[in-house]
Amino acid sequence: MAENADLVEWPKKDKRRFLHVVYRVGDLDRTIQFYTECFGMKVLRKRDVPEEKYSNAFLGFGPETSNFVVELTYNYGVSSYDIGTGFGHFAISTQDVSKMVEAVRAKGGNVTREPGPVKGGGSVIAFVKDPDGYTFELIQRGPTPEPLCQVMLRVGDLDRAVKFMEKALGMRLLRRIERPEYNTIGMMGYAEEYESIVLELTYNYGVTEYTKGNAYAQIAIGTDDVYKSAEVVKIVNQELGGKITREAGPLPGLGTKIVSFLDPDGWKQVLVDNEDFLKELE
């Protein structure tokens, strides 16, 4: 029992951080061009794996050693995906939303909400879609170390989802936003909201299930001990739901230790060994 109690405390003591979000695109070069020219991201690394028939590109606003980045996956011959109803958006903070919106428009992007103040607040925001139909919220803010600032996913039970992220992943509930007319939002993360990436969990009243599609894949999070972290996830899975989809251990070929699992809403998360991850970047 004491061992279990010690395990349950582990996620809060662990050195956790968001590493990257993985999703699939129909044309890697097209997406890279859009993200670099419209959003100002940089290509950090690329890899092609012909024997598995896929390519990856990692893009972001800073080095992978410190920043959250996107990992784009292109599967040979697959030009489009179903985003589903559960995935919400990514968010980018910028000092000039209007300028970014104009860049998106000039490159043929889809502006779904023109720049303007958020309802009931002072922040200026806009919404745009990339060439694959992924939504990006653009938020006007001062300079920040992490411009790639949100991943929004919809959940069927906010209290359960928050509890899972706290217990299994060691996140903190940074802010809860109640919008009585339509939804409640929980902002989850490892550091303050304006300094780092947050996971925005949205519960729309009365909606308990969403389609996952086949476009969005997973979020990767760093840990100092994959095996210990996996044991905690198993305990929390029993309590709240979800399941391990890949037992803790090294990836063939790479040697990086990971564990992957589904949360109670069916969203996939992957915990990655911090040291192994840094070796991958060398």
UniProtKB/Swiss-Prot annotation:
The modification N-acetylalanine is found at residue 2. PROSITE patterns: GLYOXALASE_I_1 (PS00934), GLYOXALASE_I_2 (PS00935), VOC (PS51819). Its cofactor is Zn(2+). This is Putative lactoylglutathione lyase. One of its GO terms (cellular component) is cytoplasm. Keywords: Acetylation, Lyase, Metal-binding, Repeat, Zinc. It comes from the Eukaryota.
